[in-house]
A protein has these predicted regions:
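Domain-level detector for secreted/extracellular nuclease and nuclease-toxin modules, and
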Residues: 16-161
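Bacterial Sec-dependent N-terminal signal peptides
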Residues: 1-21
Length: 161
């Protein structure tokens, strides 16, 4: 299964490699339409569309550069609520004894280029429940691949959701 997932990802990435940012109609591709009910939060290192009904992100998007990958701020932090976000959000207690990992949507390892970005990576608005085997296995492998590509190609754009 791991090989199939990796090959599928590689095919998708290679198919898009070298294509312009124009869509089929010839118009430039744009950000998805954001409505008044969307909760888009712009952090220093990533942007998240947070779903106040499911209490997990709809998506997270960010640019990762080769310089950022080499950041020196150590992983540290404790998951907590984003007190500046006034909408309903998950709490640490939601994950207590649940059997689920608190899985970063934008990984802390991609945000080690500043103390602030590292801190923001631990907001509960940046996590979703993940099976431990997935979180520490294939998902981790995919996160590392994104960092490898950022080093190889100078920057990558990552969207998760």
């Amino acid at each position: 299964m791991r090989i199939i997932s990796t090959l599928l990802l590689l095919v998708v990435c290679l198919t898009g490699y070298g294509q312009t940012s124009k869509g089929i109609s010839g118009s430039l591709l744009e950000m998805p339409k954001i409505t008044a009910s969307d909760n888009v939060i712009i952090y220093t290192g990533f942007t998240v569309s947070y779903n106040t009904k499911t209490l997990i992100p709809n998506w997270v998007a960010y640019e990762l550069t080769n310089v950022e990958v080499d950041g020196q701020f150590p992983r540290k932090g404790q998951f907590g609520m984003d007190l500046s976000f006034k909408g309903r959000q998950a709490m640490r207690e939601d994950y207590s004894n649940s059997g689920w990992d608190k899985g970063h949507m934008c990984p802390a390892a991609d945000l080690k280029w500043s103390e602030k970005t590292m801190y923001e990576s631990f907001y509960l608005t940046n996590i979703c429940p993940q099976n431990h085997e997935l979180n520490s296995g294939d998902w981790l492998t995919l996160e590392k691949l994104g960092r490898e590509w950022a080093k190889k190609f100078d920057k990558v754009y990552i969207i998760c959701g």
